[in-house]
């Protein structure tokens, strides 16, 4: 009950605005103020690259829409980048209203809030004509914000590598009182664990890659072979596969499918 699988609206801005307003109304209408709750808000504007003209003014010059026919390796990405920034700006305004609603209800004092994304957007940073997402596993497409608000904790910035699958172990062990080892239910670790990662996996069940060390990208192709790139998406020839690390990664990837 209360789970919405679709949001009405003709545009991404209309849908994102409705998502924020529905959440605010839900917070204001809560009868049992002490009852724990979980909410998931998904904003789509930075994915859609679409805005009404009157909302596309904050960062200039900006494209009116994402004209993919004009993308090439030699173009200036600024107008496309500014369109993206304007979509983020509009969602930032909506997030401000969401946080203000939580403050008004006194919920910022006892609610963990996580702000992140499911992927990033690339704007040809590596000058290999990659744009948007879902075309490679470089940091420009998989690196996202990870911002936590935890009541009672001092603000702190971490610069070590984390992953989305660190979220559940952190919540379970640090805040929900789960005692058993995190390996029982997750590939992740605590967000605050600065131990260097020898590898991690990114992607989905069918389309994924292994990030080995700091900058080696081992991408599984549709044929089942591995293509290897460095951090700037330059193909790596004669790559010596670290067999032990790769074997461990494959076992971890499959162990929850028993």
Tell where the protein language model's regions lie, with residue ranges.
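A short beta-strand-to-alpha-helix junction
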Residues: 14, 78-90, 136-142, 153-169, ...
């Amino acid at each position: 009950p209360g789970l919405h699988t679709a949001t009405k609206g003709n545009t991404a801005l209309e849908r994102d605005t409705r998502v924020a307003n529905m959440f605010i109304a839900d917070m204001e209408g809560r009868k049992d103020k002490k009852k724990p709750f979980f909410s998931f808000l998904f904003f789509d504007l930075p994915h859609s690259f679409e805005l009404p003209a009157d909302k596309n003014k904050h960062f200039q010059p900006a494209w009116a829409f994402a004209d993919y026919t004009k993308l090439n390796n030699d173009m200036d990405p600024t107008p496309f980048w500014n369109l993206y920034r304007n979509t983020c700006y509009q969602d930032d305004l909506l997030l401000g209203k969401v946080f203000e609603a939580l403050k008004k209800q006194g919920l910022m004092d006892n609610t963990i809030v996580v702000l992140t994304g499911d992927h990033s957007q690339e704007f040809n940073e590596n000058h290999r004509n990659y744009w948007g997402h879902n075309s490679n596993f470089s940091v420009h497409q998989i690196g996202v914000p990870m911002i936590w608000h935890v009541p009672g904790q001092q603000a702190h910035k971490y610069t070590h590598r984390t992953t989305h699958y660190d979220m559940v172990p952190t919540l379970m062990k640090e805040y929900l009182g789960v005692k058993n080892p995190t390996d029982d239910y997750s590939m992740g670790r605590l967000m605050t664990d600065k131990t260097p990662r020898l590898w991690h996996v990114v992607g989905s069940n069918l389309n994924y890659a292994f990030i080995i060390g700091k900058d080696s990208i081992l991408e599984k192709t549709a044929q089942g072979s591995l293509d290897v790139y460095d951090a700037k998406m330059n193909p790596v020839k004669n790559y010596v596969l670290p067999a032990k690390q790769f074997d461990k990664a494959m076992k971890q990837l499959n162990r929850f499918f028993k």
